[in-house]
């Protein structure tokens, strides 16, 4: 250890001071910066208060797993049957993040992303007592958008006062793929929920059971079939399941 003049440091009446702390302690035992409970509680409450003052209302729709496949990491029977209203701070008020909307080889793609900040204790109080997980859904009624949580960042900011009072959620537009999605609004005791909040979830319930991304089911397919009638000849599907036929559907010109 580097040598120094101990007389440079102030000493208490019992002749102790920082000189002794420097020689015998890992951290200063008289200063509790990272583990002072009162400061941690104050910071946590201030974050929660700020979110409730400047935040937005969202709906949390957790994914329920019925029969998860541990090999492929998926559950073909997963469903969404419950929803809670909660407060979140919208980090990106300038607009959505991500690749946004663009045309690709597969048509128009919408890859909007949003970043939300929540206070974990406030979130657990308003929701189901648990923190959000990847794969759960967030409905943003202000823009009538449904997002799927991609990542929950627990370390930004990193341990202020020795505790994390913020969770940052990164979510992308949800792509419906046949799941049962019929959320019912849950009303925790003691939390004021407006009477008609349940109606806001109708937009989410309308996804349940659809097979096409268009409002009119199979509208694009029907249009293609209609335009193709002039050029496409009738055909028979050969898979041993269709109607029986006496001759081969392939004519001689095709076989040559």
UniProtKB/Swiss-Prot annotation:
Kindly report the protein's main subcellular placement as a broad class: virion
Q: Which UniProt keywords apply?
A: Virion
A Pfam family of this chain: T4_neck-protein
Q: Which residues form a coiled coil?
A: none
Q: Where in the cell is it found?
A: Virion
Q: Name one GO cellular component term.
A: virion component
Protein purpose: Plays a role in the association of the virion head and tail after packaging of viral DNA within the head. Together with gp14, forms a neck at the portal vertex of the head to be ready for the tail attachment.
Name of the protein in its database record: Neck protein gp14
Lineage at the top is:
Viruses, Duplodnaviria, Heunggongvirae, Uroviricota, Caudoviricetes
